[in-house]
Amino acid sequence: MLQLVFTNKFKKDVKLLQKRGYDMELIKKAILLLEVTGNLPSEYIPHKLAGNYTDYWEAHIKPDWLIIWKLFIKENEIWLTRTGTHSDLF
């Protein structure tokens, strides 16, 4: 099992989504899967990012709800860095 690290920006993103009425059970499920496996199943469409987010991964919790993370294998950590809509994040 990986150690979860929540960035301050991720925590703020979650609060904003809660305020907007998003179903937090969906992100909890995704986070649990990341914690256990380090990745998400294909239905989340996980993929690597490029540019400023090189070495980061993104997946879709819903079609316009994303989660971004970075895996640190040596440290046995997964950093949850951002979550939100495409327009929130990019």
Language-model features, listed with the residues they occupy:
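Basic, Lys/Arg-enriched alpha-helical interface segments
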Residues: M1-D64, F72-W79, S87-F90
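Short, charged interaction patches at domain edges and termini
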Residues: W69
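Residues forming the ATP-binding cleft of Hanks-type serine/threonine protein kinase domains
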Residues: G84
